[in-house]
Amino acid sequence: MPLSAQQLAAQKNLSYVLAEKLAQRILKGEYEPGTILPGEIELGEQFGVSRTAVREAVKTLTAKGMVLPRPRIGTRVMPQSNWNFLDQELLTWWMTEENFHQVIDHFLVMRICLEPQACLLAATVGTAEQKAHLNTLMAEMAALKENFRRERWIEVDMAWHEHIYEMSANPFLTSFASLFHSVYHTYFTSITSDTVIKLDLHQAIVDAIIQSDGDAAFKACQALLRSPDK
């Protein structure tokens, strides 16, 4: 008898929850690379789900490069080099409280490689309208120094950085900012206390971009990223 739409949705939800649980165990090293996962029946009994839900969960992890199912062998955990850490779900599963500092360390390396280049491009190819909007965001950041609101600062700070990526007109850089939106938010939330952060360094980037000085924008961004707390 065919499953109803509601039953299919419930099954899909169960398979996603199972995929997350299995991914967490793999990320924590409970299932090490090279090992074979328990079979469908064992996993189904262990987590209280159907074999269909297990199969769907395995498909999800396979698509992320975490496992590789093989007939008569089983589902093998793949080396970490195969895992697609640019996958939004995998990134979310990885960024637990336990792994937070590890994720942020890797994230900051990516930022210092990419964000200065985004600033350079923003200065050289950004439109007058985009530069005006960047200046508007900067003005609000400056205003928050006098009347600080933590949540609003985080929102504006994120919008400021993401707008620079958009100004670069480079689809890969724009996608990076979009993909790592949740990481940016978590990171900015963790470093923001009760005051604005490095306002002068943000302003130096804006000044360089508005003046269409790509080299100065590049160096100003490096200064921001290498300064403490940012």
Swiss-Prot record:
The signal peptide, as residue positions, is: none
Q: Which residues form the HTH gntR-type domain?
A: 12-80
Which keywords label this protein?
Answer: DNA-binding, Transcription, Transcription regulation
Q: Which residues bind DNA?
A: 40-59
Any matching Pfam family? FCD
**GO molecular function (one):** DNA-binding transcription factor activity
Lineage top rank: taxon: Bacteria
Q: What is this protein called?
A: Uncharacterized HTH-type transcriptional regulator YieP
- Gene label: yieP
